[in-house]
Amino acid sequence: MTPLFKKFLGINWILILTMLGLLAFGVYAIYNASYFRDDSGVLKLHLKWKDQMKWIGLGLPFLLGAALIDYKWVRWACVPMYMAGLGGLVYLQLYGVEVKGNLAWVTIAGVNVQPSQFAIMAGIVMLAVVFGELPRMWPVFRRPWLRLIVAGIVAGIPAAMVIKEDLGSGLVWGPVFLSMMLVGSIPFRYMITLILGALCIIPIVYFFVLKPYQQARIDTTWYMITNQMDKVDTRGDGWVPTFVQIAVASAGFEGKGPMSEKVPDHGTIHRQFFPSTEAHSDFIFGVICEEFGFRGAVLLLTGIALLLIQGIFMAFYSRDQVGRLLVVGVVAMFFAHTFQNAGMNLGMLPVIGLPLPFISYGGTFMIVTLFLMGMMQSVWVHRNISPVKRKTMGGRDFRDDDDD
């Protein structure tokens, strides 16, 4: 048995099966949300489910490659990856394509790419090395506050670059950073101080950083959850949140059936009132709730929760701190996306356009998601393989990371 095949057999297949189940359900949900759309436009919305399958097929080799290669490469590749991520964000500011007020995409060879997704992927890798390896590489960084400053710069620069144009991608950095900080041996008092400082900054960001339409979305959500419906502009910023809530609330336990089969003339809410270009991406959870009901939504969230719990389990078995931090960062990112997407589809959180992992349509996000799943698998596959050898020099043990 070759070492590579042995690694392949050592993959966490329960996690793979859970992921494949979510991906299959996501493709089916996208089909439900888009197959009936007009096919005369250049977007070909009725074929989005096929496009999603292509993106999955493109991303699976990245998953397999990342899983079978020992993740120790992140120690030397983290800086180039991070700089490339920042370079992508700079390119976005210069040549980005603005869609519905969001400057989040660049067009490369006719394909829209979202640099912020690659930036957060690189950021997770960089933060794992900062929290896990920096104290060993330079003893001065054994002081927690120094590591926190470096990590804050690593996360703060890309977050600040995207938050004004792409609020959702900017906010994802928060839970990712806090989760990795918690696992990265930073004293709890520093986390409390950081959270309190962030709370003080929120009003400044709201009034002086966010655009008017972003403020309006936050205001609309606040009015809806506090039952001030007279202040909600149902023909403007409150249009989509209102109809998404109606779609979810009217679904019942069993829903209106796949392809809206239980509704006369298939006249479901999502077909009539959801934005045609976003029903299969940002509002896919609302479509699932309406089509498959409460049980479908619970089944979906249970599947995602099972995947995240398995990720946490894998983190406990990591051979080193870097692997543990990688897994925690990925789990935190998936949780943030799931929490925000489900929350905005239920009318509990503002509409800021974060895709639902494994379910929402999206090329860039799908490839990043599958690559990060591969990184999690690499931590599991190599959990019993020592990344270093012990050597003795002058009667004292030290580690040599260049040996395998």
Across the structure, where does each feature detected by a protein language model lie?
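Juxtamembrane loop-helix boundary motifs flanking transmembrane segments in multi-pass membrane proteins
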Residues: M1, G41, L45, G236, ...
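Long extracytoplasmic/lumenal interhelical loops at the membrane interface
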Residues: F253-R295
